[in-house]
Amino acid sequence: HYPMPRDIELLVLDAERGLGNGRLLPAGPLREPASRLGSVDVVLERNSNDPDCGFSYQPSCARHLASGRQVAWSECVDEWREQSMVAITGLGQPMQFFEMLRGQGLTMETESLGDHEAVTPAHLDRRGEQVVLVTAKDAVKLPECTDPRVWVVAIEVALPSSLLTRLTAL
């Protein structure tokens, strides 16, 4: 990605984890050397209370994977509250997804796959009649899925106003 032209360069960190052990994958959590902090335009931090760099995200709606129908998140929570559910993801930090869902009042089983591992029909088959929640990243790996239990959680990110002002000015 270095040769690609850009107007602004963002670096995203988790404020709680920071740079971890400071080492690159697979020995540590970093995808690039810590020295990159000095060459980016903006640093964004998840779990930060700093209004200039902190960001948060919440579910905005859910898309029924088989039909494409979108439903407001509040309606989904009301409907699913009494149902048996499982959240399955191949995210690198799956607990963030699971905690976000629990923070919305949902109770569910969870299944963490390896980072970038695809959710497969076999994963779904083990789940009986449970409602299955996945991320958009997971859903793109299920292009032919017609399983009526699978819902994709759409996430809305709240960026710092200073960044939004800067992006608008570009």
Named regions from a protein language model:
Residues H1-G54, C61:
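Phosphate/Mg2+-binding loops and adjacent switch elements
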Residues H116-V131, K137-A139:
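A short, acidic, amphipathic alpha-helical segment used as a generic capping/interface helix at domain edges
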Residues G114-A118, R149-L170:
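Short, flexible loop segments at boundaries between secondary-structure elements
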Residues V43-D50, P94, T135-V140:
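Short, polar loop motifs at secondary-structure junctions
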Residues R63, S67-R69, E75-H116, D138:
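Redox- and metal-dependent alpha/beta enzyme cores, enriched for Fe-S-associated oxidoreductases
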Residues V40, G90, V132:
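Residue-level signal for inorganic ion chemistry
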Residues M4-P5, A34-S39, V77-R81, R127, ...:
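Short, conserved loop/helix-junction motifs that constitute active-site signature segments
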Residues L13, F55, E111, V153:
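Hydrophobic residues at beta-strand termini and immediately following loops
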